[in-house]
């Protein structure tokens, strides 16, 4: 059975959907550990309740980001994890780390990439007058939110929507598509080659499976 590590910084709502999918068998894998860069992240409580090992790596305990990521990488390597899942991990990974685990890191980002990389995506979409938003699951590389797109889900933005309403609508889609992509990877159906995502041996378009 494949082993997953989940990296978090906060509430761990996406983590919970992954825990549930592993427990139900929808994802044929085991979560080997949950790692946080915040000691008070509620996601650590979720992991403890699910009897999943937890580890905390605080930036203040390392001289630089590279040293911290090396320590996390060594820990993950000692567990022989097959996949690293970023689920609200609010720290940019160093290029050395992303290269070390190339093709083995997935992230979910709350926008229809390449649109609105970075932070405050809901506010930016509303301020731009967009009539739709969404979320993207992608492989992670050295470029922030720039790796090969696997799957996207769109949601409407209505004229009177608040940021919170768009976020809630988007998160509901996240809880559907992230476990699905993780399932594809753990079943051996999804892989990265030459910075392109392949599903069942077929290269996905740049916008991912949903827009094929």
UniProtKB/Swiss-Prot annotation:
Its EC number is 2.1.2.2. The record marks 145 as: Raises pKa of active site His. It holds the Pfam family Formyl_trans_N. GO terms for biological process: 'de novo' IMP biosynthetic process. The keyword Thylakoid does not apply. Keywords: Purine biosynthesis, Transferase. It is an enzyme of class 2 (transferase). One of its GO terms (cellular component) is cytosol. The active site is at residue 109. InterPro entries: Formyl_transf_N, Formyl_transf_N_sf, GART, GART_AS. (6R)-10-formyltetrahydrofolate binds at residues 90-93, 107. N(1)-(5-phospho-beta-D-ribosyl)glycinamide binds at residues 12-14. Pathway: Purine metabolism; IMP biosynthesis via de novo pathway; N(2)-formyl-N(1)-(5-phospho-D-ribosyl)glycinamide from N(1)-(5-phospho-D-ribosyl)glycinamide (10-formyl THF route): step 1/1. GO terms for molecular function: phosphoribosylglycinamide formyltransferase activity. It catalyses: N(1)-(5-phospho-beta-D-ribosyl)glycinamide + (6R)-10-formyltetrahydrofolate = N(2)-formyl-N(1)-(5-phospho-beta-D-ribosyl)glycinamide + (6S)-5,6,7,8-tetrahydrofolate + H(+). Belongs to the GART family. Catalyzes the transfer of a formyl group from 10-formyltetrahydrofolate to 5-phospho-ribosyl-glycinamide (GAR), producing 5-phospho-ribosyl-N-formylglycinamide (FGAR) and tetrahydrofolate. NCBIfam families: PurN. This is Phosphoribosylglycinamide formyltransferase. It comes from Haemophilus influenzae (strain ATCC 51907 / DSM 11121 / KW20 / Rd).
